[in-house]
From Swiss-Prot:
Keywords: Cytoplasm, Fatty acid metabolism, Isomerase, Lipid degradation, Lipid metabolism, Lyase, Multifunctional enzyme, NAD, Oxidoreductase. In the N-terminal section; belongs to the enoyl-CoA hydratase/isomerase family. In the central section; belongs to the 3-hydroxyacyl-CoA dehydrogenase family. PANTHER family: TRIFUNCTIONAL ENZYME SUBUNIT ALPHA (PTHR43612), TRIFUNCTIONAL ENZYME SUBUNIT ALPHA, MITOCHONDRIAL (PTHR43612:SF3). Its EC number is 4.2.1.17, 5.1.2.3, 1.1.1.35. This is Fatty acid oxidation complex subunit alpha. It comes from Yersinia pestis. PROSITE patterns: 3HCDH. Residues 8-197 are annotated as: Enoyl-CoA hydratase. Pathway: Lipid metabolism; fatty acid beta-oxidation. The gene is fadJ. GO terms for biological process: fatty acid beta-oxidation. Residues 590-614 are annotated as: Disordered.
Length: 747
């Protein structure tokens, strides 16, 4: 790590140590924070420390490192934007960042970034301003510019430096997607100059600084071709077309990124930087960015909560009942993310093998991409074991049940765990439709029974619903939430009512889409209207993907407990009697050449929300199966209009979300927004149902619902909570609160 320093200047977040060999080490360590983030007040500190370094006559080079164990710089502190009241304020903020990083880029001796851990957003922009970048060959090291996911663009020079470093094509791909780049990939594309083991990272960076100025790496011929006039024009035309097709114009940051990158390439750096700062300022004030940032703060705050006032029990071992798709996924995230031993129980060895293969294949992908060593794959696989009986379950702290959606079977599972498990073992059911109170009805220890509703595919979807029943103990709630967090999940605690939260707000949306079809609207018109609105996939395509039989299974339960407004249109019975189950058997609303085995529901009983936005955007447009119109006695003709279709479907979802809040199904609007966005793909740029309701105004929503009542029936009757809010001109979120403050008052 080098000899002792001969000179030291200390600031709250930055320390400059100069070694006897005249290499300066700038260490970034934000006091009191687990990770480094760049804050507005650091600008002067960085400028001061650079001035101190510049004044050293014998200085040969600088190396910038992090004082955090597994984080370089996780990005800029986006609460800075909350302090900006105008686009001009945000523009000045960006210009300040540009100015500071320009000082690093213009420093008279080589500056090397030694990167270990997350190097994201403003962190990568700082690294790009350095003259060389060395990163650790470590799974914790990632590089990226994720600002687009917050409705922003990189505002401290990232849109200008990255294209010149790696080429415009690769740069646009990184900035437009916000994807994270792993070390080997970063080296291959020229984002970093070397990748080394973590324990020699600083030494290699010091040697690089001593080596003086190095020749700049030449871009690959493909990137050079795309930098020419013809190649550049073609590239930007294709990128813009694909971007608009994906965003449907709902994410202005993507289009501004394209404009700003093009500006810098065509007119030079000064024009590019000016355009970047201006675009950053305008985007920071956009409603889309406000909504996306609200989701960021909401999920961040939720991950800090325990779900209960009680203290969670320590979790040392986990059991899983059922080795199907859901059981295998749950075992996977428990072993690979939580790092906990998992014992799988299935009625036959094939189910256990299937669950083991799930994790083996997932880890195998990481090995093949050089993100994991084979020895680590073997180590993590050793955390998972299986049995056709309950041997080993006497030592587990919590059991997650993922078997058939059959009440008597689940009650038997509870009895088995109470017999073969420990006295403190928690029983968590992954049911999507059955009341937890009924599952616990025969339990000897009902206080240790709870619902834990995952969404498929488990290793991709961030959301879980934690469902306590009236006898569930506070300790059980806290422990279950703790497990979900260890698995990398965002957990919302919801009440034990039919459909819980996510499926309950999805059901009326699906039903109304089917009614639009019965009104004669073509299937593709219904789906396109909702995709244009911002959903990742249309409702009819969703039914095909989920399985029409699976999606409609919950409807009778909702009708029984919540009333006739949940009654499914008769078309579903007709479709099911015709043997149409969707993609899994090749017969649904759309035509399929080959049914996909992976799309079939498992014995774990996938729910409508279980198959969600992860793969939806990857689905190619398929032709509609026109025979379904004859089956339903419908002559398709587009006549409703996209606006009417969208209003009918979304207004029912919004109304039901407010009912869920009024009935305490969800604890606050924040949880409702997170559940809808991460559970069913509600348009993120709208912030979730409750933030969208605030943007529309309760009075306007009530007015729209009452008009729909006159046109289509009582199912559109606005709930009393919404009517009261309209009369009193109330909102779900405080009007005068900053976005980052909302999470503190959401309850």
């Amino acid at each position: 790590m080098g000899a002792s320093a001969t000179n030291s200047v200390t600031h709250p977040a930055f320390t400059l140590n100069v070694r006897p060999d005249n290499i300066g080490i700038i260490t970034i360590d934000v006091v009191g924070d687990k990770v480094n983030t760049l804050k507005a007040e650091f600008a002067d500190q960085i400028a001061t420390i650079l001035q101190q370094a510049h004044a050293l006559p014998k200085l040969q080079g600088l190396v910038i490192v992090s004082g955090k164990p597994d984080s370089f710089i996780a990005g800029a502190d986006i609460t800075m934007i909350a302090a900006c009241r105008t686009a001009h304020d945000a523009r000045v903020l960006a210009q300040k960042g540009q100015s500071i990083l320009a000082q690093i880029a213009a420093f008279p001796v080589p500056v090397v970034a030694a990167i270990h851990g997350a190097c994201l957003g403003g962190g990568l922009e700082l690294a790009l301003a350095c003259h060389s970048r060395i990163c650790s060959l470590d799974d914790k090291t990632v590089l990226g510019l994720p600002e687009v996911q917050l409705g922003l663009l990189p505002g401290s020079g990232g849109t200008q430096r990255l294209p010149r470093l790696v080429g415009v094509s690769k740069a646009l791909d990184m900035i437009l997607t916000g994807k994270q780049i792993r070390p080997r990939q970063a080296l291959k594309m020229g984002l970093v100059d070397d990748v080394v083991p973590r324990d020699i990272l600083l030494d290699v960076a010091i040697q690089r600084a001593k080596a003086g100025w190095l020749n700049r790496r030449a871009l690959p011929w493909q990137e050079r071709l795309l930098s020419g006039p013809l190649g550049k024009a073609l590239l930007f035309r294709i990128v813009r077309k694909k971007t608009l097709a994906k965003t449907r114009g709902h994410y202005p940051a993507a289009e501004r990124i394209i404009d700003v990158v093009r500006k810098g390439l065509d007119q030079g750096g000064p024009s590019g930087y000016e355009a970047e700062a201006r675009a950053f300022g305008e985007l920071a004030m956009s409603p889309q960015s406000a909504a996306l940032r609200s989701l960021f703060f909401a999920t961040t705050s939720l991950k800090k909560e325990t779900g209960s006032a009680a203290t969670a029990r320590a979790i040392h071992r986990v059991g899983v009942l059922g080795g199907g798709l859901m059981g295998g996924g749950i075992a996977n995230v428990t072993a690979t993310r939580a790092g906990l031993p998992v014992r799988i129980k299935d009625i036959n060895p094939q189910g256990i093998n299937q669950a083991l293969k799930y994790t083996w294949d997932a880890l195998g992908k990481r090995v093949r991409s050089k993100r994991m060593r084979p020895t680590e794959q073997q180590r993590q696989m050793m955390l998972i074991s299986g049995s056709t009986d309950y041997r080993g379950f006497e030592r587990v702290d919590i059991v997650v049940e993922a078997v058939f959606e059959d009440l008597s079977l689940k009650q038997q599972m509870v009895a088995d765990i109470e017999r073969f498990g420990a006295a403190h073992t928690i029983f968590a059911s992954n049911t999507s439709s059955l009341p937890i109170s009924q599952i616990a009805a025969l339990a000897q220890r009902p206080e240790q029974v709870i619902g834990l509703h995952y969404f498929s595919p488990v290793d991709k979807m961030p959301l879980v619903e934690v469902i306590p029943h009236e006898k569930t103990s506070e300790e059980t709630i806290a422990t279950t939430v703790a497990l979900a967090r260890k698995q990398g999940k965002t957990a919302i605690v919801v009440a034990d009512r039919a459909g819980f939260y996510v499926n309950r707000i999805l059901a009326p949306y699906i039903n109304e889409a089917a009614r639009c079809l019965l009104d004669g609207e073509p299937i593709e018109s219904v789906d396109n209207a909702l995709v244009d609105f911002g959903f990742p996939v249309g409702p009819m395509m969703l039914l095909d993907e989920v399985g029409i039989d699976v999606a409609t299974k919950i409807m009778p339960i909702l009708v029984e407990q919540l009333g006739p407004r949940f009654a499914a249109p008769p078309s579903f019975d007709v479709i099911l009697k015709d043997g149409r189950k969707g993609r899994k058997n090749g017969r649904g609303f759309y035509l399929y050449s080959n049914p996909t085995k992976n799309s079939s529901p498992t014995k774990n009983g996938n729910s409508p929300a279980k198959r969600n936005s992860f793969k939806w955007r990857k689905n190619k447009v398929k032709p509609v199966d026109a025979s379904i119109y004859t089956l339903l006695g419908v002559t398709p003709k587009a006549h409703l209009g996209a606006g009417v279709i969208t209003q009918r479907c979304t207004m029912l979802m919004l109304n039901e979300a407010v009912r869920c809040l009024d009935e305490s199904i969800i604890r606050n609007p924040r949880d409702g927004d997170i559940g809808a966005v991460f559970g069913i793909g509600f348009p993120p740029f709208l912030g979730g149902p409750f933030r969208y309701l605030d943007s529309l105004g309760a009075d306007k929503v009530v007015q729209a619902l009452r008009l729909l009542v006159q046109q289509y029936g009582e199912r559109f009757e606005p709930c009393q909570r919404l009517v009261t809010m309209a009369e009193q001109q109330q909102q779900f979120y405080p009007v005068d609160a900053n976005i980052d403050e909302v999470t503190d008052v959401a309850s």
